[in-house]
Amino acid sequence: MDRAEKREFVAWLNGAFKESGSVVVAHYTGLTVAQMSDLRSKMRDAGGAVKVAKNRLAKIALQGTESEGIADLFTGQTVVAYANDPITAPKVAVEFAKANDKLVILGGAMGATTLNADGVKSLASLPSLDELRAKLVGMIQTPAQRLAVLTSAPAGQIARVIGAHARKNEAA
């Protein structure tokens, strides 16, 4: 990689760090190519990305971003996972690390908040933004449905009483 390519890569990685909701840094020593490809595909399917970058270039790319505090984590063979949704990257990385003990989570960042490995694992246990939205919609819809049932029930009862009264008058 020559200097121009490095500059271009750093600019691209800087943009990725600025746009991401969360960043996870992990050691990947000992992962096979197949395992790394599996991690990349799982992250891509979830809406994130995985990148192996030279530590020096990653530290330069972090400058000027909210995630600048995680620069110390870039030692050894590191991989960076990031996604726009703050929960996606930690969730996929932690699930993959459970199945593959060669992936060791070092820490990460969510916005300006620097996270250690336990913080990333805690973040991974939270529901995703889409799941939270679905729960919120469910909470809003349930009372509205109950209200509709309650308001329509008296009208139905009145109609039955009037119908019974009309049948009684016809019979008499």
From Swiss-Prot:
GO terms for molecular function: large ribosomal subunit rRNA binding; structural constituent of ribosome. SUPFAM superfamilies: Ribosomal protein L10-like. Disulfide bonds: none annotated. One of its GO terms (biological process) is translation. Keywords: Ribonucleoprotein, Ribosomal protein, RNA-binding, rRNA-binding. GO terms for cellular component: large ribosomal subunit. It holds the Pfam family Ribosomal_L10. CDD domains: Ribosomal_L10. InterPro entries: Ribosomal_uL10, Ribosomal_uL10-like_sf, Ribosomal_uL10_bac, Ribosomal_uL10_bac_type, Ribosomal_uL10_CS_bac. The keyword Nucleus does not apply. PROSITE patterns: RIBOSOMAL_L10. Belongs to the universal ribosomal protein uL10 family. Forms part of the ribosomal stalk, playing a central role in the interaction of the ribosome with GTP-bound translation factors. Part of the ribosomal stalk of the 50S ribosomal subunit. The N-terminus interacts with L11 and the large rRNA to form the base of the stalk. The C-terminus forms an elongated spine to which L12 dimers bind in a sequential fashion forming a multimeric L10(L12)X complex. This is Large ribosomal subunit protein uL10.
